[in-house]
């Protein structure tokens, strides 16, 4: 299935696919757990009707003067378009600002990924511009549209997010 291929960095050829290899999956889980313990990244599964169908992640947490992180997400094709990702990202914002006490969260999206950009539109997240050749996707350095929300914006909108999404 090529549903996510246009948006995801290529897995190095020497690494086994965690969706097809139990040991690779176990290693991935251990790495995610280490990241969580170190406070540099957190991953959460999306479940619909008890079935795992996607993930939302907060990655690259930087402390000190920045207090920032990036968010990534994906969902199975069968569940796309039902606003599950928007709901999950809203909950992740709450976690980022109210539990992790970050100051800024950023989401970077390939410009042609209209479904992912729609999530940002639905949540009314501020677009900041385009980062040229930001991330390598399938061997090509792709531009990314940058979206962000700060703690001040969260404080102004938290009640609305909670009422609509959380």
Predicted segment positions?
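Alpha-helical hinge/cap motifs
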Residues: 72-73, 81-83, 101, 129
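Structural motif
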Residues: 1-2, 100, 124
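GNAT-family acyltransferases
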Residues: 1-78, 140-166
């Amino acid at each position: 299935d090529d549903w996510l291929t246009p948006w995801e960095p290529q897995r190095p050829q020497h690494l086994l696919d965690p969706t097809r290899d139990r040991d690779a999956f176990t290693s991935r889980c251990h790495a995610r757990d280490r990241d969580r313990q170190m406070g540099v990244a957190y991953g959460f599964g999306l479940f619909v009707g008890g079935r795992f169908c996607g993930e939302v992640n907060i990655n690259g947490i930087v402390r000190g003067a920045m207090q920032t992180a990036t968010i990534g997400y994906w969902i199975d094709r069968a569940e796309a378009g039902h606003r599950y990702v928007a709901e999950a990202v809203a909950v992740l914002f709450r976690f980022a600002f109210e539990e992790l006490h970050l100051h800024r969260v950023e989401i970077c999206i390939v410009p042609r990924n209209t479904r992912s950009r729609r999530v940002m539109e639905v949540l009314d997240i501020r677009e900041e511009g385009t980062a040229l050749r930001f991330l390598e996707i399938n061997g090509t350095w792709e531009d990314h549209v940058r979206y962000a929300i700060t703690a001040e914006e969260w404080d102004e909108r938290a009640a609305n997010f909670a009422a609509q999404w959380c």
